[in-house]
């Protein structure tokens, strides 16, 4: 008898959750076992009615009561303990880790400790605690499969998806669209509005990640992820601006060969690849018509995109705590920008100041990660007044 793969989707109401559920709708291979949401209870209720999960998780009791008033045939759990439970249940096979921000850290670790197949879209798990998460994955024989289009592309380009071929890799090259302001100089961005920063030319994404794309913070975080996912030194990671977002990333091998993964910019492709791995599943994605594209590439200038400069410097110095500071400061500053409390250029300007002024030892456990994160946010709040 055919057995469906049971999946927990952390962050089911976000853009990655949407694409994951779109894949599930098109196939008959997956059973949604648990769904979680932070604020959009109405949408979560609709998803519960459609997919009939056994569990749903919301952040607090008031949202639990609201969800229970909308749906009756699902067990509603609350808070961090609920997230960790649905990430580690014996019945589930796959955990889609798509919560935005450091809130995704503990449930991702819970899935790793339970030996689950983790589809990783939550950047912060690797950005803030990469050394700790990789240790947990290895120790518990879990699987960590990247969902970001760039890292999933690299995952597909590396022979056997393991580390036996690492000596053969000369360079991992991440591509970046460059965002909506890729052709503008910094002095032209003084009066950028949140609406302009969120208007990504190629991808449909949430507001925070759209701003991160425009500042190239998103790509800087992806450099950190690649560092941990593929066990390569910082000098073996490169970034190219590729406005068409068709070549999702590539690997250069020591014999001069380049292997790239291409496709239309649709998150269903990397998500389906991760969900079905080690096989491939059929999903409804537009075919790539090569006759319609002229693919162009250019170097990502570190002076123009200073987020890259900050992160590469942190990795070269093995200053992993500084990456926690960088990430926490960015989250606070982007929120301030979206609420029109600071100017667009201050996102990076203030982050440079904070990253330079705060110094911590590399964390030895997840509690220390959260402590560095908390202190950074408090410091940013004091700077912003």
From Swiss-Prot:
Known pathway: Isoprenoid biosynthesis; isopentenyl diphosphate biosynthesis via DXP pathway; isopentenyl diphosphate from 1-deoxy-D-xylulose 5-phosphate: step 1/6
Function statement: Catalyzes the NADPH-dependent rearrangement and reduction of 1-deoxy-D-xylulose-5-phosphate (DXP) to 2-C-methyl-D-erythritol 4-phosphate (MEP).
Catalytic reaction equation(s): 2-C-methyl-D-erythritol 4-phosphate + NADP(+) = 1-deoxy-D-xylulose 5-phosphate + NADPH + H(+)
Chain positions recorded as NADPH binding sites: 13-16, 40, 122, 124, 206
A molecular function GO annotation: manganese ion binding
PANTHER family for the chain: 1-DEOXY-D-XYLULOSE 5-PHOSPHATE REDUCTOISOMERASE (PTHR30525), 1-DEOXY-D-XYLULOSE 5-PHOSPHATE REDUCTOISOMERASE, CHLOROPLASTIC (PTHR30525:SF0)
Needed co-factor(s): Mg(2+); Mn(2+)
Binding site for 1-deoxy-D-xylulose 5-phosphate: 123, 149-150, 177, 200, 213, 218-219, 222
InterPro entries linked to this entry: DXP_reductoisomerase, DXP_reductoisomerase_C, DXP_reductoisomerase_N, DXPR_C, DXPR_C_sf, NAD(P)-bd_dom_sf
SUPFAM superfamilies: 1-deoxy-D-xylulose-5-phosphate reductoisomerase, C-terminal domain, Glyceraldehyde-3-phosphate dehydrogenase-like, C-terminal domain, NAD(P)-binding Rossmann-fold domains
Signal peptide range in chain numbering: none
Residues given in the record as Mn(2+) binding sites: 148, 150, 222
Assigned keywords, A-Z: Isoprene biosynthesis, Manganese, Metal-binding, NADP, Oxidoreductase
Protein name (record): 1-deoxy-D-xylulose 5-phosphate reductoisomerase
Homology family: Belongs to the DXR family.
Organism: Francisella tularensis subsp. tularensis (strain SCHU S4 / Schu 4)
GO BP terms in the entry: isopentenyl diphosphate biosynthetic process, methylerythritol 4-phosphate pathway involved in terpenoid biosynthetic process
Its EC number(s): 1.1.1.267
HAMAP family: DXP_reductoisom
């Amino acid at each position: 008898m055919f057995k469906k793969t049971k999946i927990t989707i952390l962050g089911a109401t976000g853009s990655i959750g949407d694409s994951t559920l779109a894949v599930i709708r098109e196939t008959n291979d997956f059973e949604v076992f648990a769904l979680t949401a932070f604020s959009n209870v109405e949408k979560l209720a609709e998803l519960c009615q459609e997919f009939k999960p056994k569990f749903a998780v919301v952040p607090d009791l008031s949202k639990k009561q609201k969800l229970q008033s909308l749906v009756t045939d699902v067990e509603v759990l609350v808070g961090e303990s609920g997230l960790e439970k649905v990430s580690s249940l014996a019945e589930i096979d796959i955990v889609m880790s798509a919560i935005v921000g450091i809130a995704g850290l503990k449930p991702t670790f819970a899935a790793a400790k339970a030996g689950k197949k983790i589809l990783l879209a939550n950047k912060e798990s690797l950005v803030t605690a990469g050394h700790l998460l990789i240790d947990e994955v290895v120790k518990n024989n879990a699987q960590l499969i990247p969902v970001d289009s760039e890292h999933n592309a690299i995952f597909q380009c590396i022979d056997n998806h393991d580390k036996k071929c690492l000596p053969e890799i000369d360079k991992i090259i991440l591509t970046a669209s460059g965002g909506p302001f890729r052709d503008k100089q910094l002095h032209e961005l003084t009066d950028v509005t949140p609406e302009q920063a969120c208007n990504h030319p190629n991808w449909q994404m949430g507001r925070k990640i759209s701003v991160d794309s425009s500042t190239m913070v998103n790509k800087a975080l992806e450099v950190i992820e690649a560092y941990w996912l593929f066990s390569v030194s910082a000098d073996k990671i490169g970034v190219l601006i590729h406005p068409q977002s068709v070549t999702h990333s590539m690997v250069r091998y020591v014999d001069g060969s380049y292997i790239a993964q291409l496709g239309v910019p649709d998150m269903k492709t990397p998500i389906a690849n991760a969900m079905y791995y080690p096989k491939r599943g059929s999903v409804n994605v537009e075919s790539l018509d090569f006759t319609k594209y002229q693919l162009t590439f250019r170097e990502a200038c570190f002076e123009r995109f200073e987020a890259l400069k900050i992160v590469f410097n942190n990795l070269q110095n093995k200053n992993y705590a500084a990456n926690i500071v960088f990430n926490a400061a960015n989250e606070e500053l982007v929120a301030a920008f979206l609420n029109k409390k600071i100017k667009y250029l201050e996102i990076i300007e203030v982050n440079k100041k904070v990253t330079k002024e705060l110094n911590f030892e590399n964390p030895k456990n997840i509690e220390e990660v959260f402590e560095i994160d908390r202190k950074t946010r408090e410091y940013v709040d004091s700077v912003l007044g």
